[in-house]
């Protein structure tokens, strides 16, 4: 199979039929075999009923229904596990992404041998102050921290080699950082393609300005996880050991100083009256706790790699 098209959605009943019709026309015109995965992330409208009706008419459609709203990352994770296409394309269900871009994205992955092709909505039809400006700041920070030079990390329209999505774990709110996760996994042939953007024809946006705050926090998390996530003991153990050693040496110096004073006949100064005593004690205690945190982190990672943090009601 050439393509798996993955579409997370939340309350998008008005756009689903039009979206699939455009996808179907594009793939048939380009002679591409394909499947579509709709992931209903806790919709409260008729989205799932529409997906079921489309499935009856078009066997290449598949659907995953979450028991509640878990988020875009969990939706992508659930679909990535089930895709069969050589190239996986993700896109939003709100018709702001153009299905007509699919053939060229597919060609760039197959013929140009890119691991990831990310869409770049250079000209956006969003509110300047609440979306465009924060998005530019966010993307600039993401490029600087991650070392992956994309203009639009938030663009939902992306194409991946099958090996990429099968090799990474998308969790939390990390969907916007899939290219960074992929680069950390060794898939470094990443490029971008300028794609058109249009105002949302139906419904309202499900994202507010708070997503950028979460995005920056996720960026810090990603920086840490990419370096120490697989082996937290490398970070916590090293910092904890260093703090313990500094605290121990400080306490040792205080003890030696006290013995020297006693040898000289100087009495009356208790070690506990010296603030360095409490500093040394605190550093030794914190060092021990950090070391234990690193050990517990190792154990948690080893026992929870396969844990899914979402519940699926139905798969069709």
Where are these regions (language model features)?
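Acceptor/aglycone-binding surface of glycosyltransferases and processive sugar-polymer synthases
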Residues: 62-68, 72-82, 87, 99-177, ...
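A conserved acidic beta->alpha catalytic loop
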Residues: 40-49, 95-96
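Hydrophobic helical membrane-anchoring modules
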Residues: 180-316
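Donor nucleotide-sugar binding loop of glycosyltransferases
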Residues: 12-15, 43, 98, 273
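Cell-envelope/extracellular polymer assembly enzymes that use nucleotide-activated donors
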Residues: 2-4, 35
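Short, well-formed alpha-helical segments that are part of the catalytic scaffolds
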Residues: 12-27
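Short beta-strand/loop segment that forms part of the nucleotide-sugar
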Residues: 32-42, 64-65
């Amino acid at each position: 199979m050439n393509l798996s098209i993955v579409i997370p959605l939340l309350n998008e009943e008005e756009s689903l039929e039009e979206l699939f019709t455009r996808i179907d026309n594009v793939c048939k015109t380009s002679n591409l075999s394909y499947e579509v995965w709709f992931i209903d992330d806790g919709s409260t409208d008729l989205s799932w009923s529409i997906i079921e009706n489309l499935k009856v008419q078009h066997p290449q459609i598949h659907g995953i229904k979450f028991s509640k709203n878990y988020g875009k990352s969990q939706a992508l994770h659930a679909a990535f596990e089930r895709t069969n296409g050589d190239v996986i394309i993700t896109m939003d269900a709100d018709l702001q992404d153009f299905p007509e871009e699919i053939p060229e994205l597919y060609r760039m992955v197959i013929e140009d041998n890119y691991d990831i092709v990310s869409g770049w909505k250079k000209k956006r039809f969003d509110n300047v102050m609440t979306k465009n400006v924060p998005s530019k700041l966010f993307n600039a920070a993401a490029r600087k921290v991650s070392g992956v030079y994309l203009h639009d990390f938030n663009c939902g329209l992306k194409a991946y080699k099958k090996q990429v999505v099968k090799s990474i774990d998308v969790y939390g709110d990390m969907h916007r950082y899939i290219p960074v996760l992929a680069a950390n996994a060794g898939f470094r042939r990443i490029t971008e393609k300028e794609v058109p953007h249009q105002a949302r024809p139906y419904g309202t946006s499900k994202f507010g300005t708070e997503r950028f705050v979460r995005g920056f926090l996720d960026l810090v998390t990603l920086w840490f996880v990419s370096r120490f996530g697989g082996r937290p003991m490398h970070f916590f153990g090293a910092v904890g050991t260093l703090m313990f050693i500094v605290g121990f040496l400080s306490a040792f110096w205080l003890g030696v100083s006290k013995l020297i004073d006693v040898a000289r006949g100087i009495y009356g100064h208790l070690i506990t009256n010296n603030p360095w005593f409490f500093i040394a004690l605190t550093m030794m205690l914190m060092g021990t706790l950090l070391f234990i945190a690193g050990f517990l982190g190792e154990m948690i990672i080893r026992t929870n790699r396969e844990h899914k943090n979402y519940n699926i009601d139905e798969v069709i």
